[in-house]
Curated annotation (Swiss-Prot):
Keyword Chloroplast among record annotations: yes
Subcellular compartments: Plastid, Chloroplast
Protein name, entry field: Small ribosomal subunit protein uS14c
Keywords: Chloroplast, Plastid, Ribonucleoprotein, Ribosomal protein, RNA-binding, rRNA-binding
Function: Binds 16S rRNA, required for the assembly of 30S particles.
Organism classification: Eukaryota, Discoba, Euglenozoa, Euglenida, Spirocuta
SUPFAM superfamilies: Glucocorticoid receptor-like (DNA-binding domain)
NCBIfam families from the UniProt entry: PRK08881.1 (NF006477)
Family membership: Belongs to the universal ribosomal protein uS14 family.
Length: 100
């Protein structure tokens, strides 16, 4: 189980990304399309004033059950430990143990 502070920090970052993603997209596209250097600098200064935690790359994939960030399976949204337990109990439809 991850620390509660790490999970809370992740939630804050998700909210910030959702709030500022449209502004970031608008500033970015306007900055790329702008011809004059002064206007481009002004637009990028607005982009720099946005919070750092509103960047999408700051987010970390975490298990929905435990909050663990390592050993994460994207297709299920679970860590490897929880995935194994749920597969053994038959809670994941279509998942079977490999046998050869």
């Amino acid at each position: 189980m991850s620390k509660k502070s790490l999970i809370a920090r992740q939630r804050k970052r998700i909210i910030l990304v959702l709030i500022h993603s449209h502004n970031r997209y608008v500033y970015r596209t306007n900055g790329k399309d702008e011809k004059s250097f002064e206007k481009k600098l002004r637009i990028y200064s607005f982009l720099q004033k946005l919070p750092r935690n509103s960047l999408r790359c700051r987010l970390r994939n975490r298990c929905y059950v435990t909050g663990r960030s390592r050993g994460y399976f994207r297709t299920f949204g679970l860590s490897r430990h929880i995935l194994r337990d749920m597969a053994h109990y038959g809670l994941l439809p279509g998942v079977t143990k490999a046998s050869w």
